């Protein structure tokens, strides 16, 4: 040991903490309390000094009679018994269990004190209780424990513990939780040495068994998992559509895939699993996650565009994951297609095509006409056969979450790719910081299945919470084991949280940066799906610079709630909402606590706003002013007018010329304008709180009972 605490040294020397502190101050050694440390050099000097003093003190007195032999024997026996009974939980000072009786029966204070010192010295000398040997007697304490647990661990009564806590200015009850620092101070007050518990976590015990290598004879061939990568608008989803013969592209806003999907197809009685990762740079983290679970990467490059920035990034991800790449040169039906230029640009990035003497397979295809799609699939099967993909179906399942979201009817739902083992309905699982029992499984066709083997993508329900996209799934023995693992993980996270400070907004960001007041910009990100949360998070983190670090402290699925606002208040954070809205309580709390909430439908706008704020150029001319809210309580189909919502105005007022957004379960479904606003059969300019009305939304008919229509307008503010 390089240093020793004051109370440990005092115990070793057989004196009180106060005496030792006074002595240290006399020797100009700075200490503040019994928990302060003294280096070995100074400790040796003190030991030598006190040893000399004790020698003078304990010179034999000729007039004093020797102690009674029986008393000495009793003392020695008691000391020996005390030493033998020392353990981690019930370590007591030997000196407390030994009676100090003088030969003539006198109980004089000075002799009692002297006997204590002698016994301490004898104990140290005879039993070599050094700092090192004490290691066996150190009690291990958990990071968090109650007063009752501490009293049991230290073998002291709860009232003694509470008395010590009151002495420290802490008013506690028997069930109050204490942290390790407080508990260690209490232990030191009783002269008991403690250290943090370093036991093996339950999850390590469980996962060591789960991740045990499979025996070669148990391994069987499994289907390949393919990720389609490439630059935005190069035709990844269209290529998958051609393969699956579906039309996903038409349903995606702006033709850009925003959520990961997984699908299975059969080619010559062999199965291939496709992961459709989004192509835009904003979803880099989702694409990186796809590369981790994939066996083959299809790199889509448009024959007329060539290699683009996100193409290079996709190559990097595939190479980092050591995934074999097949290049699909798409849009070959276009007159401007130039495959040779594409091959040259790929060679510049380290991908040398086979026909040019390299080892990368390339297939010219057309997603629109279906040209060479079969050849591409044959190449996928060929590459997967060369990779010898195997898994053990006869073990507990291991998999990865591809996508996760909160479904109104089903609760937390996760799309999982089973990578090893077999997942059954009724299995207890741990996924990241959540757990559950599999209630139902659906394949990519929407059919219920009872079993999911290796290389199978299924949607599962029965989880306690929405997991993180990219979390690993482990099947465990039972719910009890799953819950224990998750509780340990959550406790670790809780121990690392909570900050406070001055409120921050985007408008004041640059001025605080200039004054040096702001070093971290804390963000809370809420979105409609977990994949979107990750995408927004990764995009904003990239904006960090030398002056300010973008720090997403929390991300979640669903609307912005009051608890999010409270976290923002405590953490000095800005709330970013992507495709979600704040609840009424959250909006009120944000106004009261002066928390900045920014909501976006397009990810680029969020990036632009924060970038502009960091450069000091954010000068908003318009702000959104909420006018009112109406709840849809019935729907009516009117010929020529579409679907009309029978609404009740629950807040503010609805204006005929206002802009509106339709919110369902705190997620924005549509933004637009009011087509018609009526009270009974008459047109109305506005409808106030507490009145019913009929609302028709321009070019939108998917109204449902329970939807909230929010009316607002953009108000110009003074610069």
Curated annotation (Swiss-Prot):
Where does it live in the cell?
Cytoplasm
Q: Name one Pfam family in it.
A: IF2_N
Record key words, sorted: Cytoplasm, GTP-binding, Initiation factor, Nucleotide-binding, Protein biosynthesis
The GO molecular function terms of this record are:
GTP binding; GTPase activity; translation initiation factor activity
Keyword Plastid found: no
Segments carrying the region annotation (G1) are 230-237
* Segments of this protein annotated with the region G2: 255-259
Q: Where is this region: G3?
A: 276-279
**Region annotation (G5) ranges:** 366-368
**Record's Gene Ontology CC terms?**
cytosol
Ranges for region Disordered: 54-75, 97-122
Q: Does the keyword Transport apply?
A: no
- In what ranges is there compositional bias, type Basic and acidic residues? 54-67
Entry's CDD domains?
Answer: IF2_eIF5B, IF2_mtIF2_II, mtIF2_IVc
List the residue ranges of the region (G4).
330-333
Compositionally biased, Basic residues: which spans?
109-122
Q: Which residues bind GTP?
A: 230-237, 276-280, 330-333
Regarding protein family, the annotation reads: Belongs to the TRAFAC class translation factor GTPase superfamily. Classic translation factor GTPase family. IF-2 subfamily.
- Name the UniProt record assigns to this protein: Translation initiation factor IF-2
Q: State the organism named in the record.
A: Alkaliphilus oremlandii (strain OhILAs)
């Amino acid at each position: 040991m390089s240093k020793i605490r004051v109370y440990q040294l005092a115990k070793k020397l057989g004196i009180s903490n106060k005496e030792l502190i006074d002595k240290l101050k006399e020797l100009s050694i700075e200490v503040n309390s019994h928990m302060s440390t003294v280096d070995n050099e100074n400790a040796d000097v003190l030991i030598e000094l006190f040893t000399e003093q004790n020698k003078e003190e304990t010179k034999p007195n000729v007039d004093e009679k020797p102690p009674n032999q029986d008393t000495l024997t009793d003392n020695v026996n008691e000391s020996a018994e005390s030493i033998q009974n020392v353990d981690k939980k019930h370590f007591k000072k030997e000196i407390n269990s030994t009676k100090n009786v003088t030969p003539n029966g006198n109980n004089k204070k000075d002799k009692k004190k002297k006997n204590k010192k002698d016994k301490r010295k004898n104990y140290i000398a005879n039993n070599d209780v050094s700092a090192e040997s004490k290691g066996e007697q150190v009690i291990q304490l958990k990071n968090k424990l109650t007063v009752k647990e501490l009293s049991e661990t230290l073998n002291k009564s709860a009232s003694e513990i509470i008395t010590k806590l009151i002495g420290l200015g802490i008013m506690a009850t028997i069930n109050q939780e204490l942290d390790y620092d407080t508990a260690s101070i209490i232990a030191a007050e009783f002269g008991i040495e403690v250290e943090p518990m370093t036991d093996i976590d339950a999850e390590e015990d469980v996962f060591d068994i789960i991740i045990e290598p499979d025996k070669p004879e148990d391994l069987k061939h499994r289907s390949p998992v393919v990720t389609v990568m490439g630059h935005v608008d190069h035709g990844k989803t269209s290529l998958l559509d051609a393969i699956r013969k579906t039309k996903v592209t038409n349903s995606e806003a702006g033709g850009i895939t925003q959520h990961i999907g997984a699908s299975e197809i059969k080619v010559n009685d062999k199965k291939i699993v496709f992961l459709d990762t989004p192509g835009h740079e904003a979803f880099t983290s989702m694409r990186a996650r796809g590369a981790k679970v994939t066996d083959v990467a299809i790199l889509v490059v448009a024959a007329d565009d060539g290699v683009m920035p996100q193409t290079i990034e996709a190559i990097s991800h595939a190479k980092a994951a050591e995934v074999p790449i097949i290049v699909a040169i798409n849009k070959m039906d276009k007159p401007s297609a130039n495959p040779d230029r594409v091959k040259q640009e790929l060679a510049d990035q380290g991908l040398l095509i086979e026909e040019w003497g390299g080892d990368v397979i390339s297939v010219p295809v057309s997603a629109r006409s279906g040209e060479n799609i079969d050849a591409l699939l044959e190449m996928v099967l060929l590459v997967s056969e060369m990779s010898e993909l195997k898994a053990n179906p006869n073990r507990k399942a291991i998999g990865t979450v591809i996508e996760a979201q909160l479904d109104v009817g089903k609760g937390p739902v996760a799309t999982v790719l089973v990578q090893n083992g077999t997942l059954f309905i009724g299995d207890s699982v741990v996924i990241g910081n959540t757990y559950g029992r599999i209630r139902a499984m659906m394949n990519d066709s929407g059919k219920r299945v009872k079993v999911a083997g290796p290389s199978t993508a299924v949607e599962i329900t029965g989880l306690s919470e929405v997991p993180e996209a990219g979390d690993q799934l482990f099947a465990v023995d039972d719910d009890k084991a799953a819950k224990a693992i998750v509780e340990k993980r959550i406790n670790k996270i809780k121990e690392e949280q909570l900050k406070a400070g001055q409120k921050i907004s985007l408008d004041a960001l640059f001025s605080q940066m200039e004054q040096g007041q702001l070093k971290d910009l804390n963000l809370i990100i809420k979105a409609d799906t977990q994949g979107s949360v990750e995408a927004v998070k990764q995009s904003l983190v990239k904006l960090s610079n030398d002056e300010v670090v973008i720090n997403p402290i929390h991300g979640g699925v669903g609307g912005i709630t009051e608890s999010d606002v409270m976290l923002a208040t405590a953490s000095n954070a800005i709330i970013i909402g992507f495709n979600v809205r704040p609840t009424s309580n959250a909006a009120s709390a944000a106004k009261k606590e002066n928390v900045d909430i920014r909501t976006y439908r397009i990810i680029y706008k969020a990036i632009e706003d924060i970038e502009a704020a960091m450069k000091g150029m954010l000068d908003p001319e318009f702000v959104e002013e909420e006018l009112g809210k109406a709840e849809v309580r019935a729907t009516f189909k009117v010929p020529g007018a579409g679907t009309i919502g029978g609404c009740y105005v629950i807040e503010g007022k609805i204006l005929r010329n206002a802009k509106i957004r339709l919110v369902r379960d705190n997620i924005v479904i549509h933004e637009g304008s009011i087509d018609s606003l009526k009270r009974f059969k008459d047109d109305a300019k506005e409808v106030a709180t507490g009145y019913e009305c009929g609302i028709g939304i321009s070019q939108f008919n998917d109204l449902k009972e329970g939807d909230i229509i929010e009316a607002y307008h953009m108000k110009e503010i003074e610069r």
